[in-house]
Structures are given as structure tokens and as C-alpha cells.
């Protein structure tokens, strides 16, 4: 199999995987009504995935040690195919959440396997990692947009049945890949983690991404409920279209080198991204649905700018243990997403939309000040 075909298969698999992860997000108001549960409980369908993505860099290095990458991909895809089809048959909140929890366990294994296949191509590592990031962003957008459309036209159960067919195709394609490498997994030790956290630069970067993804995941998770509050007759298709702005992440990830060149230093780019992120967060106080739609685009530009540059910094500040520093980065990132998928929903339910947005803005002002006061730690700024 040619390198090009192998990459196409991996990109397709990642796209479908991220679609599975985020398909529930625009459907949460519909699922909350279907299962007669609160907004907070409906938000847990996404939060549980984030939680396992957070702990996977820590535990999967031990669980999947010396397992063939293709074997990991095949077994995990079969499990995901079965569970996703089971979602289309679920008739209670408890059953749906249990199945999503099983999916949350296997999704990190597929992501790890896909990244390993791309990383083994040593001559094109940087290009392949850019492709990986773009594929995850594209998958997240496709999953959100199309799940809304399919749910409105054919019912929410068809969303998960159709994704199961897409996973079946992914399993068929993965069988065609000729790849004998082992999964490249980190097995962290407590001493190594503590040693890295003694470097204050990592405290800054990890805190930054915890807060940024808390705000990002939190706001996008409750946005469908806000739209339903403003316009009760809004269809699932229109809610799904709100997430088109997510596609800005592809543009940012593929042009970040030009953005850095313009600002000259990475930390300046981060602070510019935070400024855009804060301004767009405050724009969500507006009650005009059209303005909210375009605000999502600006919101995603700010977030993905910070995320892309922070990833580069986290992977370049140490010559050794890059696998561990990267894994810890992802853990803090997804812990922020997991907490952000639940806690803001509680605040919104108890205190309303405006108070929730002000909470997000306060956190962003705090992290902006923290970065500003810590700038001398980074040579990139000077």
C-alpha cells in the first residue's frame, strides 16, 4: 500500500472517530427531552469521552504495552461499531450513558493507534502531525453538523446507526493497511511527572490549556440549549450548523507558521489568541442568533490559535521526555474539557446564561494576567 493511501485511510478513521465523539453535542437538547433528564445529565454524554481522553496518556502506556498497532485499531473499531449501533437502540438515559462510557474507553486507543501509524513515517513527521490535527478538527465539525441534519430528517437513532456503517468501512480499510509496528506509548512514573511540574513553564502552559479548553468545551456544550432558549423552534440542523466555525481550526493548524512569523514570537501569538478568545466569549452575551453563529467562528480562531502554539511550546521546551510532556499536556487539556462539559451546565441551569458567560470571561482574564506575569519564563517572548 502506498503512503498516500495509508494516510487517506487513517484520516478517514480519525474523521469518523471524532464524529462519534461529538455527534451527541448538538443533539443534547433533543436527548434531554427524549430521556426526560436535565441539561447537566445530557452534557455528560460528551463529558465522559473527555474524561477518558484525559486519563488515557497516563494509563494506556501500561495497558497497551507491546500490542500491535493494527490489532489495537481492529479490536477497538469492532467494539466501537457495536456500541455505537447499540446507542441507536438505547431507550433510557442510564443505558445510553453506559454505552457512551464503553466508547470512551476505546476511543483513546484508536486515536493512539492512528497517531502511531502517522508518526512512524519519520521523513514526514511534521506534515503527518499537521494532517492529524486537521483531521481531528474536521471530524469534530462533520460529526456536529451532520448529526443535527440527520437527526432532523430521519431521527436521532439514525445518526448512530449511520456512524456504525461508517465505522464498518473504517474497519475494512484498516485491514488493508500493512503496518507491523507497536503502539508508541508513554509509561509515566510519578517522579518524572513531579520533575516536569517543577519547571514553572509547564505549570503555565498546562494551566493555560486547562482553562482555555474548559471555556471552549463548556460554552460549545451549552450553546444548543441557549439557542433553544432564544428560539424554541430551532431545528437540529440549524443547531448543527452553529459548529461550522469549528472548521477554522483546520485553517489555523495549517497556517500557524505564518501567524508566528507575523508576531515573531510564540508567546505573543498566544496572548493575541487569548485576546480574540476573550472578546468572542463576551460576544456570546448577544441574543441575536445570527451574531452567535458568526461569533463561533471568531471563538474557534482564538482557541485554536492558543492550542496550536501551546502544543508547539510544550513539545519544544525540553529536549528529553517529549512523549511525557505531550501526554501531560493532553491530560490537562481534556480534564479541562471534561469539567467544562459539566460544571458550566450547572451554572447555566442555576444562574442563567449571562452569569455563565461572565464566569468564562473572568477565567480568561485571570489566565491572560497569569501569562503576562509569567512571560519572562519564556525565551520565546523575549
Walk through the language-model features, giving the residues of each:
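A late C-terminal transmembrane helix in Major Facilitator Superfamily
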Residues: 317-353, 360
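Cytoplasmic helix-loop-helix junction between adjacent transmembrane helices
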Residues: 99-136
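Juxtamembrane intracellular "pre-TM" segments in multi-pass secondary transporters
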Residues: 177-205
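Extracytoplasmic
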Residues: 5-39, 57-60, 219-225
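Paired small-residue
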Residues: 83, 94-103, 290-298
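Helix-loop-helix hairpin linking two adjacent transmembrane segments in secondary transporters
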Residues: 124-125, 130-178, 222
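C-terminal transmembrane helical hairpin of 12-TM major facilitator-type secondary transporters
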Residues: 266-310
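Conserved MFS/SLC helix-loop-helix module at the cytosolic interface between two early adjacent transmembrane helices
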Residues: 55-93
Amino acid at each position: 500500500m502506498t503512503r498516500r493511501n495509508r494516510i487517506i485511510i487513517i484520516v478517514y478513521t480519525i474523521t469518523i472517530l471524532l464524529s462519534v465523539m461529538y455527534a451527541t453535542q448538538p443533539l443534547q437538547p433533543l436527548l434531554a427531552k427524549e430521556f426526560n433528564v436535565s441539561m447537566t445529565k445530557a452534557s455528560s454524554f460528551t463529558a465522559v469521552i473527555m474524561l477518558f481522553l484525559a486519563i488515557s496518556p497516563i494509563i494506556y502506556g501500561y495497558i497497551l504495552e507491546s500490542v500491535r498497532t493494527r490489532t489495537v485499531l481492529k479490536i477497538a473499531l469492532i467494539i466501537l461499531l457495536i456500541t455505537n449501533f447499540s446507542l441507536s437502540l438505547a431507550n433510557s438515559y442510564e443505558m445510553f450513558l453506559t454505552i457512551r462510557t464503553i466508547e470512551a474507553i476505546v476511543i483513546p486507543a484508536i486515536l493512539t493507534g492512528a497517531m502511531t501509524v502517522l508518526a512512524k513515517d519519520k521523513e514526514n513527521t511534521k506534515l503527518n502531525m499537521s494532517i492529524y490535527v486537521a483531521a481531528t478538527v474536521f471530524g469534530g465539525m462533520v460529526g456536529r453538523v451532520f448529526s443535527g441534519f440527520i437527526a432532523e430528517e430521519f431521527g436521532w437513532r439514525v445518526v448512530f446507526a449511520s456512524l456504525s456503517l461508517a465505522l464498518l468501512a473504517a474497519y475494512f480499510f484498516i485491514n488493508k493497511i500493512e503496518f507491523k509496528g507497536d503502539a508508541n506509548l508513554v509509561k509515566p512514573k510519578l517522579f518524572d511527572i513531579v520533575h516536569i511540574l517543577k519547571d514553572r513553564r509547564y505549570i503555565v502552559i498546562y494551566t493555560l490549556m486547562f482553562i482555555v479548553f474548559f471555556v471552549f468545551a463548556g460554552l460549545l456544550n451549552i450553546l444548543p440549549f441557549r439557542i433553544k432558549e432564544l428560539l424554541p423552534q430551532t431545528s437540529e440542523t440549524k443547531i448543527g450548523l452553529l459548529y461550522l466555525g469549528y472548521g477554522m481550526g483546520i485553517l489555523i493548524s495549517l497556517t500557524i507558521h505564518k501567524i508566528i512569523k507575523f508576531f515573531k514570537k510564540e508567546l505573543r501569538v498566544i496572548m493575541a489568541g487569548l485576546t480574540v478568545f476573550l472578546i468572542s466569549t463576551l460576544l456570546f452575551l448577544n441574543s441575536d442568533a445570527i451574531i452567535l453563529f458568526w461569533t463561533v467562528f471568531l471563538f474557534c480562531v482564538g482557541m485554536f490559535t492558543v492550542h496550536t502554539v501551546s502544543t508547539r511550546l510544550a513539545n519544544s521546551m525540553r529536549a528529553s521526555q517529549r512523549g511525557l510532556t505531550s501526554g501531560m499536556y493532553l491530560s490537562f487539556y481534556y480534564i479541562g474539557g471534561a469539567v467544562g462539559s459539566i460544571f458550566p451546565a450547572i451554572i447555566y441551569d442555576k444562574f442563567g446564561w449571562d452569569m455563565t458567560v461572565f464566569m468564562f470571561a473572568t477565567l480568561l482574564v485571570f489566565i491572560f494576567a497569569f501569562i503576562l506575569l509569567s512571560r519572562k519564563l519564556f525565551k520565546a517572548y523575549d
